[in-house]
C-alpha cells in the first residue's frame, strides 16, 4: 500500500500540495492538539457500528436465497472497491476529515465542502431514526407500550438529548462506550446466527428454499423481480470512510489498513449470518420490522436468549 504524501517542500520549510494548494490547517493542528489514542480495536468497533446495521437484514430477506447473491454481488462491485479506495487514500493522506481532506486535494474547496456536507447531514437524521428504532424495540416487547405519537416523540427527544450529553464527555470515555456497544451488538448477532443453526439441528425444516438454482438468481421481472434489493444492499455497505474522519487521532498508520481488514470481514460475516438465520427460521415473508430478528431468536433459542438479543441490540 502506498504511503507517499503528495506534497512538495517550499523554501523556508513549508509544504505545498500539487497544483499550488497549501495543506489544510487541520493536517497540522489536530496532531498537535489532540492525542493519538485510537487503536485498531477502537477504529474497528466504530467501523462495525457504522456499517453493520442489523435493520438492513429484515429489509433484504424478501429476496429469499437470492439475498445472498446480492450480498456477495454488492460486496464485489461496491463494498470491497470502496474499502480498497479508502485504504489507499487513508494511507496516503492520514489526516483528520478523511473525505473532506481527500476531496479538497482532488477537486478544491467548493466540492470538498459539498462532499463533506452531504456526508455529514444524514448523520443528523440518523439520531432521530435511532430513537425511532428504540421505539420499535419497546413496541416489539409489548404492543401496548408507546402507542401514542406523543409518547414516541418523548423517546426520540430523550435519545437525542442523551446523544448530546454523551458527545460532550471525554473522548476516551465516549470511545469506550462505542467499543462496549459494538461488543454487545456482535453478541446479539452471534446469538442470531446460532439460532439458525440450532433450528436446523433440532429437526426443523428451513422456511426458505435453497435447493434450486432459480432460488439464487436475479429476477428482472418488473412486477415480481428482486432487482430493487441491489439498492438496499448498496445502502447497507455505505460508510467505509467514516471512522477515518478521526484520522489525525490514530496511534499509527497500520491502524488504517488493519481496521479496514478486520471490520470488513466482520461486516460481511455479520450480514450473511444474520440473513441466513432469518431466512431459515422465518423465511422471506418475515416482517420488515427490526423485531423480526428477535423473533427469530425467540423461536429457535427461547425467550430468555431473545431478551438478551434485545438488550444487546438496544445498546447499539
Name each model feature, range by range.
Residues 35-47, 69, 108-121, 155-156, ...:
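Select transmembrane alpha-helical segments in multipass membrane proteins
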Residues 67, 71-72, 180-184, 243-279:
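Junctions where cytoplasmic loops transition into the N-terminal start of transmembrane alpha-helices
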Residues 138, 151-208, 260-265:
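Membrane-interface loop-to-helix entry segments
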Residues 1-73, 79-86, 211-217, 249:
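Membrane-interface "cap" regions at the ends of multi-pass membrane proteins
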Residues 61-63, 80-160, 164-165, 307-315:
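Hydrophobic transmembrane alpha-helices that form the core helical bundles
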Residues 58-60, 88, 100, 104-105, ...:
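Helix-loop junctions at the membrane interface of multi-pass solute transporters
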Residues 101-102, 108, 140-145, 261-316:
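TM-loop-TM module centered on a large, flexible mid-protein loop between adjacent transmembrane helices
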Residues 78-82, 192, 266-274:
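Alpha-helical transmembrane segments of multipass membrane proteins
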Amino acid at each position: 500500500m502506498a504511503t507517499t504524501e503528495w506534497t512538495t517542500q517550499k523554501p523556508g520549510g513549508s509544504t505545498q500540495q500539487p497544483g499550488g494548494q497549501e495543506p489544510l490547517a487541520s493536517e497540522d493542528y489536530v496532531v498537535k492538539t489532540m492525542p493519538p489514542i485510537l487503536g485498531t480495536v477502537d477504529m474497528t468497533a466504530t467501523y462495525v457500528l457504522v456499517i453493520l446495521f442489523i435493520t438492513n437484514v429484515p429489509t433484504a430477506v424478501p429476496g429469499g436465497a437470492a439475498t445472498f447473491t446480492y450480498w456477495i454481488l454488492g460486496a464485489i462491485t461496491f463494498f470491497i472497491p470502496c474499502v480498497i479506495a479508502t485504504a489507499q487514500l487513508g494511507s496516503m493522506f492520514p489526516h483528520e476529515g478523511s473525505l473532506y481532506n481527500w476531496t479538497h486535494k482532488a477537486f478544491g474547496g467548493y466540492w470538498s465542502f459539498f462532499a463533506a456536507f452531504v456526508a455529514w447531514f444524514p448523520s443528523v437524521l440518523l439520531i432521530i431514526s435511532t430513537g425511532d428504532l428504540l421505539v420499535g424495540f419497546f413496541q416489539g416487547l409489548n404492543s401496548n407500550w408507546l402507542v401514542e405519537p406523543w409518547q414516541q416523540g418523548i423517546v426520540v427527544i430523550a435519545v437525542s438529548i442523551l446523544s448530546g450529553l454523551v458527545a460532550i464527555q471525554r473522548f476516551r470515555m465516549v470511545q469506550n462506550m462505542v467499543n462496549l456497544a459494538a461488543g454487545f451488538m456482535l453478541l446479539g448477532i452471534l446469538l442470531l446466527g446460532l439460532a439458525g443453526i440450532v433450528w436446523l439441528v433440532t429437526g426443523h425444516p428451513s422456511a426458505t428454499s435453497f435447493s434450486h438454482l432459480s432460488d439464487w438468481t436475479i429476477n428482472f421481472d418488473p412486477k415480481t423481480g428482486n432487482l430493487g434489493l441491489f439498492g438496499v444492499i448498496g445502502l447497507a455497505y455505505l460508510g467505509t470512510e467514516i471512522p477515518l474522519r478521526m484520522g489525525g487521532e490514530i496511534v499509527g498508520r497500520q491502524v488504517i489498513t488493519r481496521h479496514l481488514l478486520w471490520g470488513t470481514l466482520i461486516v460481511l460475516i455479520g450480514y450473511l449470518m444474520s440473513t441466513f438465520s432469518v431466512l431459515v427460521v422465518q423465511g422471506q415473508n418475515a416482517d420488515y420490522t427490526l423485531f423480526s430478528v428477535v423473533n427469530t431468536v425467540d423461536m429457535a433459542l427461547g425467550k430468555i436468549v431473545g431478551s438478551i438479543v434485545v438488550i444487546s441490540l438496544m445498546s447499539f
